[in-house]
């Protein structure tokens, strides 16, 4: 692994105060330069001070040119990072030690320092205190030139973020994409910490064979890396979880002041590693195979509601591993006390990071869902304001959401579990409910209907039961159909008996014997019964069952309103042998239509209503 010298160069930000008497051409050169970020950068250009950056870029370019000249190593590795400190802007310049020994480093740096003053500052030395200095092994006199290895970059420089981080340059292949990309920086830092933790784990010394918890050792770095690795494996993100997992380990790290200071930093680093390198199945799937799953509470709830536990477990496992693509959500639907919240709560608390949807805050409903392993939507409703973002999240798409008092953040594909006793596919907009998004929402969900109420002493699902259930699912995977409603039953057909097991059927007793065909009554043809037929049976010559509409049309009061006659041949055709009788009525009063037309109709229902005779009413008192 190559070694690097570190030179810290302070950059003037106040030209009048730090460079008294500097020319106007220098000021114009600094002020006119405009910087733009490369396309692959996710940094905020508004947080970058462009005037000091112009000077810093010129300083690092001329410094590296002179370094290659004195070291006679044109391909020497370097990493330069420009930062905004509390008092001054400064650069960390890491240059490979190849070609320059420590005893002559001061001589060469003095020459480079003078070159920078003459070429860049026009002969005016900055008034910044100790503006050009090499890092020493210790402060004060007597310290040697410090040589750092490549781990210094991911340990100290890469974790820097804006606004402290301003810019970076390098010719090292592994860090080219991370110079101006904060996401790549986080990934490399997490990868480095994981690698170091695994290395320390492999080289454990004096480890207690009866416990996998870390203990205090003589080497601080080894102890710290061992601690971080153990926290990551156990999914511990807080001191409370640490105490619950291993109380002796937590107390041992609080015994000394130097180890006590590592607790918060170790938990923070472990959280970063877990969020970047781990997924939900790493903590949901148990390590040991399960022999008897029948006592598992999740198994009992699914079986109680008519689901095949093996098929349902495969749905849960595929959901956690994100193997169903767009169908990224499990919806547990049912009334209260059916176990839906019991299951969802246990799954959410088994992973180190889970987020809850705050559907009551329509402005920032997904504020808590960034960088999580599982998203839990508890007893909510789908509103018109959040439905589009919700469809993207439920479908496992990358989407940016607004956060309170922060800039928008991206939610990566994350498994979602929904619990509700209302229709989550109906979109509520004010006082109206629409179903235009019902099919897209159903295409993103697996729906479990839990309708059986649990006993009051059923108990809570534990983390270990969740891990055992997912482990059992992994060992008994079956093919899952991509459908909204998870099929129930799952009962397997019994195999057909062998020939030896088939016995002769018993003789039927005469008292319960079925009548023969000859004894059965002849079927009735209702087509002969109806003179008028409805539009459904108008062309039928054989009707095995009665029709309510045909019955109504063959009552005495049934008259064709269009032609004023019964048994209308045009509307309800019958055989030619049956005559059509026309019913003619005499009206004293006419309805307003026939009154205007001046024509007396043969039959009219409106005229019947005008000429009602109470003597003919069967309900007359």
UniProtKB/Swiss-Prot annotation:
Q: Where is this gene product found?
A: Host nucleus
Q: Where is the SF3 helicase domain?
A: 308-463
Signal peptide residue numbers: none
This protein's record includes keyword Metal-binding = yes
Sorted keywords for this record are: ATP-binding, Covalent protein-DNA linkage, DNA replication, DNA-binding, Endonuclease, G1/S host cell cycle checkpoint dysregulation by virus, Host G2/M cell cycle arrest by virus, Host nucleus, Host-virus interaction, Hydrolase, Metal-binding, Modulation of host cell cycle by virus, Nuclease, Nucleotide-binding
Compositional bias ranges of the Polar residues kind = 196-211
What cofactor is needed? a divalent metal cation
Q: Does the record bear Nucleus in its keywords? A: no
What range(s) does the PV NS1-Nuc domain occupy? 1-199
Question: Annotated region Disordered: where?
Answer: 196-216, 489-520
User: Catalytic center at which residues?
Assistant: 156 (for nuclease activity)
Where along this sequence does the record place binding of a divalent metal cation? 83, 90, 92
Q: Where is this motif: RCR-2?
A: 90-92
Principal localization reads host cell
Residue numbers binding ATP: 334-341
Cellular component GO terms held in the UniProt record: host cell nucleus
Q: Which GO terms describe its molecular function?
A: ATP binding; DNA binding; endonuclease activity; metal ion binding
Q: Which InterPro entries match?
A: Helicase_SF3_DNA-vir, NS1-Nuc, P-loop_NTPase, Parvovirus_NS1_helicase, PV_NS1-NUC
- Motif RCR-3 located where? 156-160
Give the UniProt record's GO annotations in the biological process aspect. Answer: DNA replication; symbiont-mediated arrest of host cell cycle during G2/M transition; symbiont-mediated perturbation of host cell cycle G1/S transition checkpoint; viral DNA genome replication
**Role noted for this protein:** Plays an essential role in the initiation of viral DNA synthesis. Binds specifically to an inverted terminal repeat element (ITR) on the 3' and 5' ends of the viral DNA, where it cleaves a site specifically to generate a priming site for initiation of the synthesis of a complementary strand. Also plays a role as transcriptional regulator, DNA helicase and as key factors in site-specific integration of the viral genome. Regulates host PKA activity by interacting with host PRKX as a mechanism of interfering with helper virus propagation and promoting its own replication.
Q: How does it assemble?
A: Hexamer when associated with the viral DNA ori sequence. Interacts with host PRKX. Interacts with host TOPORS. Interacts with host TBP and SUB1/PC4; these interactions play important roles in transcriptional regulation.
This protein is called Protein Rep78
The scientific name of the source species is Adeno-associated virus 2 (isolate Srivastava/1982) (AAV-2)
């Amino acid at each position: 692994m190559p070694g690097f010298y570190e030179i810290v160069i302070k950059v003037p930000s106040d030209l009048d105060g730090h460079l008294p008497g500097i020319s106007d051409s220098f000021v114009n050169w600094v002020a006119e330069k405009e910087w733009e970020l490369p396309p692959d950068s996710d940094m905020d250009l508004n947080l970058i001070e462009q005037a000091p950056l112009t000077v810093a870029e010129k300083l690092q370019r001329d410094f590296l040119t002179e370094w290659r000249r004195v070291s006679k190593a044109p391909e020497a590795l370097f990493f330069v990072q420009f930062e905004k400190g509390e008092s001054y802007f400064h650069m960390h310049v890491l240059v490979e030690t190849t070609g320059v020994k420590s005893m002559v480093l001061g001589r060469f740096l003095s020459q480079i320092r003078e070159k920078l003053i003459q070429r860049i500052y026009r002969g005016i030395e900055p008034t910044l205190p100790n503006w050009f200095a090499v890092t020493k092994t210790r402060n004060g006199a007597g310290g040697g030139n410090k040589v750092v290895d490549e781990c210094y970059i991911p340990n100290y420089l890469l974790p820097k973020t804006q606004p402290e981080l301003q810019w970076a340059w390098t010719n090292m292949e592994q860090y080219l994409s991370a110079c101006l990309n904060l996401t790549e920086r986080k990934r490399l830092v997490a990868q480095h910490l994981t690698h170091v933790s695994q290395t320390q784990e492999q080289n454990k010394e004096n480890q207690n064979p009866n416990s996998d918890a870390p203990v205090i050792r003589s080497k601080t770095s080894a102890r710290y890396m061992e601690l971080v690795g153990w926290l990551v494996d156990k999914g511990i993100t807080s001191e409370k979880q640490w105490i619950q997992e291993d109380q002796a380990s937590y107390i041992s790290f609080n015994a000394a002041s130097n180890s006590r200071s590592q607790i918060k930093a170790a938990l923070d680093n472990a959280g970063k590693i877990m969020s970047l390198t781990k997924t939900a199945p790493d903590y949901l799937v148990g390590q040991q195979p399960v022999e008897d799953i029948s006592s598992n509470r999740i198994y009992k709830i699914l079986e109680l509601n008519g689901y095949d536990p093996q098929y349902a477990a495969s749905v849960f496992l595929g959901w956690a591993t994100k193997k169903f693509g767009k169908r990224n959500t499990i919806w547990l639907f049912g009334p209260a006390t059916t176990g839906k919240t019991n299951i969802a709560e246990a799954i959410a608390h088994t992973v180190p990071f889970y987020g809850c949807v705050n559907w009551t805050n329509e402005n920032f409903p997904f504020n808590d869902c960034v960088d999580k392993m599982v998203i839990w939507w508890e007893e909510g409703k789908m509103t018109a304001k959040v439905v589009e973002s919700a469809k993207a999240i439920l479908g496992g798409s990358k989407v940016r959401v607004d956060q309170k008092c922060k800039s928008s953040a991206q939610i990566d594909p994350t498994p979602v579990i929904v619990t509700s006793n209302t229709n989550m596919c109906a979109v509520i907009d004010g006082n109206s409910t629409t179903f235009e998004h019902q099919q897209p929402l159903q295409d993103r969900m697996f729906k479990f209907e839990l309708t059986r109420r649990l006993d009051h002493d059923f108990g809570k699902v534990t983390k270990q039961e969740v891990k055992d259930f997912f482990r059992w699912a992994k060992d008994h995977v079956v093919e899952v159909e991509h459908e909204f409603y998870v099929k129930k039953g799952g009962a397997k057909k019994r195999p057909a008996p062998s020939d030896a097991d088939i016995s002769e059927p018993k003789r039927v007793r005469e008292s319960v014997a079925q009548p023969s065909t000859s004894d059965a009554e002849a079927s009735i043809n209702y087509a002969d019964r109806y003179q008028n037929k409805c539009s459904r049976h108008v062309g039928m010559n054989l009707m095995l069952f009665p029709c309510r509409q045909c019955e109504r049309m063959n009552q005495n009061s049934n008259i064709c309103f269009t032609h004023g006659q019964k048994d209308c041949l045009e509307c309800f055709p019958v055989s030619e042998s049956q005559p059509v009788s026309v019913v003619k009525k005499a009206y004293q009063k006419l309805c307003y239509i026939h009154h205007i037309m001046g024509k007396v109709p043969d039959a009219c229902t409106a005229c019947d209503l005008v000429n009602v005779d109470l003597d003919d009413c069967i309900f007359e008192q």
